[in-house]
Amino acid sequence: MTRIVVTAEIRPSEDEDKVKVAVANFFSFKSSKVEEGKYRLFVAESDTLSSLSKFHRVLREERILDAARKYLRRGIEGDRLTFMIHKQAAYVGKITFVDSENESPLGPITYTVFHRDLEAVVDWLAPRTSRGRPLWDNPMPED
């Protein structure tokens, strides 16, 4: 079963709608909510890998498949894949991976993907390349 959860803090100085746009630029969510806490937290969810199709497309447009593959593979732990991108870059339609929350001053956008075959998910999102070109284009794994 596939489950994708994307979270982003909404800091007091931020416009909630802009945070939602930053998330929606790369993730087509099925449901969303705002949770209250130290910071408000925007939580978006989906139950299908097709919700990552925009992310898949932009990785190719920006020609960052090698870097993406490295970050994605590093984020696999058991049945989950976790990675973070820079929220302000996402708002303007750019993917910038971050290693820690400190690299994104207003907090990162955190993706958590649950799927039975995370290696296949990584191979679909960011296949191996040669001289910057994908060696193959894998189909999206089944949910």
UniProtKB/Swiss-Prot annotation:
InterPro entries: PAB1135-like, Ribosomal_uL5_dom_sf
Pfam family membership, one: RNA_binding
Family designation: Belongs to the UPF0201 family.
HAMAP family per the UniProt record, alphabetical: UPF0201
Entry protein name: UPF0201 protein Msed_1787
